[in-house]
Amino acid sequence: EMCIRDRIYQRLDGLNNEDRFGVQAVVNEKGEVEGINEKLLIGAADISLNDLLSRVHEYNGIAIAAHIDRESFSVLSQLGFIEKGTPFDALEVTPFTGLTQARIVYPELDNYSFITSSDAHYLKDIGTALTKIMMEKPTLAELKMAFARQNGRRVLEQ
């Protein structure tokens, strides 16, 4: 069976130019380089947003739109809006905006749960921001319920 990464890779066009975009190292959980990814990962994939989110959910994943408050590399910067009913589980904002301000800046997205995270690109930045979530236990099912605001589970935005 094909994994979601393979489905997306089929729709990515081109090879990476290391001189222009840098090396795309494949790194394991110990920080060891296991290989180099030759695909051009910075490019667009020929897949619709709703199809991508459907695939994520087919694999029991959670779909979170990353740093929607950034002026580049976010769904809002690319599309200009998030269509009502787009099946994101949550929306992430940077610590610079924060959860309280996100509710003010994006009132049209009130039906989504917001989270914030470090969006770390460097080891030293991991854990510099976090989101507190009310759950009974740390499982994916509980996290999904929290994002959906079900059975008392929720993101704590204060």
Predicted regions and their residues:
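Glycine-enriched alpha-helix->loop->beta-strand junction motifs that scaffold or abut catalytic
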Residues: 85-90, 109-113, 130-134
